[in-house]
């Protein structure tokens, strides 16, 4: 499920299309959709999920080609897709998942086994609508969260229930991961 984003400005109508799509956790930065180069324009981002508006969020822009959504953005656990998280969005999304099982794929861009598992993890997310699938790039920016979660190798899959890590699978072991998820779901 994608969210429809509409950006508006108090400085008049947009000169380029005002609608884009973005995954919830990836919406921290998105292409600026308004024309003009006025520094620090006040804009708003309307998040629409299904037939109704979910939120109107203030957006700051410094005249570059990107805008940053403020901290007011709501973290939403989404099923049916893999959502990219970071050190700031992970725990709020886990909390919003409530009693649902959450599976976190901790990977790096350069890891061969991680690249092999990525499409399989995506396929799992599309098939299992009862589980929230997340992925975390264990880069320098997310080092603090990776350390907090105790990662030693990549890929590492953390399975959480009620906000707590209850199982872990290390390595590109698809069958073991599927079994671990089923075990946690049935407990």
Swiss-Prot record:
Sites marked Contributes to redox potential value: 112-113
Active site: 111 (nucleophile), 114 (nucleophile)
Site (Deprotonates C-terminal active site Cys): 105
Record protein name field: Thioredoxin F, chloroplastic
Key words, A-Z: Chloroplast, Disulfide bond, Electron transport, Plastid, Redox-active center, Transit peptide, Transport
Entry similarity comment: Belongs to the thioredoxin family. Plant F-type subfamily.
Matches recorded under InterPro entries: Thioredoxin-like_sf, Thioredoxin_CS, Thioredoxin_domain
Membrane-spanning residues: none
Short name of any one Pfam family annotated for the protein: Thioredoxin
Species assigned in the record: Oryza sativa subsp. japonica
Disulfide bonds: 111-114
């Amino acid at each position: 499920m994608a969210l429809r984003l509409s950006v508006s400005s108090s400085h008049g109508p947009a000169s380029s299309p005002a609608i884009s799509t973005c995954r919830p956790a990836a919406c921290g930065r998105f292409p600026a959709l308004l024309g003009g180069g006025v520094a620090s324009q006040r804009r708003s981002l309307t998040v629409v999920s299904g037939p109704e508006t979910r939120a109107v969020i203030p957006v700051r822009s410094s005249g570059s080609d990107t805008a940053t959504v403020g901290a007011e953005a709501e973290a939403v656990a989404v099923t049916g897709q893999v959502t990219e998280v970071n050190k700031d969005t992970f725990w709020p999304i886990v909390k919003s998942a409530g009693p649902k099982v959450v599976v976190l794929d901790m990977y790096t861009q350069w890891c061969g086994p991680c690249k092999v598992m990525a499409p399989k993890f995506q396929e799992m997310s599309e098939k299992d609508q009862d589980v929230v699938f997340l992925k975390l790039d264990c880069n320098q920016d997310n080092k603090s969260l990776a350390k907090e979660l105790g990662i030693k190798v990549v890929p590492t899959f953390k399975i959480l229930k009620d906000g707590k890590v209850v199982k872990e699978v290390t390595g590109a072991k698809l069958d073991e991961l599927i079994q671990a998820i089923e075990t946690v779901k049935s407990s």
